[in-house]
Amino acid sequence: MSIIQFSHANGFPAKTYSVLFEQLKEHTISAINILGKNTNSNDINYHDLTDEILESASQFGEPVIGIGHSLGGVLTLLAAAKKPEIFQYIILLDPPLFSPYKRFLIKVLRAMKIEDLFSPSGKSKKRRDHFDSKSHAKSIFLANKLFKNFHPQALNDYVIHGLTAGKNDVKLTIPVAKEVAIFHKMLTSFSKNVYKVKGTLVYAASNPILWTSDLHWINRKFTGLQVIPFPSSHLFPLEYPESTAQNINRCLKNFNLRFK
């Protein structure tokens, strides 16, 4: 049994991943439900979010397995690079870990103030964040292609935990403004320590956010990362949590065989 420190994707509270966690119940799961919950949109940044993960992971007094999806994957990588003694291994689920070429493009787009035309932030800005009720929100989600392949329970969990009731309506628990701000704060440079981390990167093979050039760069620079595909799109931990858990357990088994 391992202790897992899990970090969620941008916009999806950790409790949305309950099906995945259930499949990993032989392990102890620690997860901050909403990273940056008490930070406003203007002040949120990757470094503070990384420190939140480190604070949570360090409470166990022994090295943990760091697992993160998307944003959570990048933050897990940064955390393991900053305090390697806290992590015995990391598993990154389709992190937006881009090559220098793509990061340069992002910097140019930011300088031109047109990042939203190409970044997920543009779509996030258009998201509806208030609904009449949770049932009303669910009906809208079901018609949204973002959720079309979601595991039914994952969608239910998102309706329960991704929405907060107000006086007369419900709203997204993670506000659109904060989700957009996190996309806008995506790092365009990394410290040299990130290249020393050991672990596995599982990338989405369908409609990939990681281009072939990104994967070539990752394979060349991150010599301690095993890179493997998953036959689905970016949200696969919420779409196919059982298969994702099987992949995670295989990664952990291989880690135990290789390093223990």
Label every model-predicted segment.
Residues 5-9, 69, 203:
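The conserved beta1-alpha1 loop
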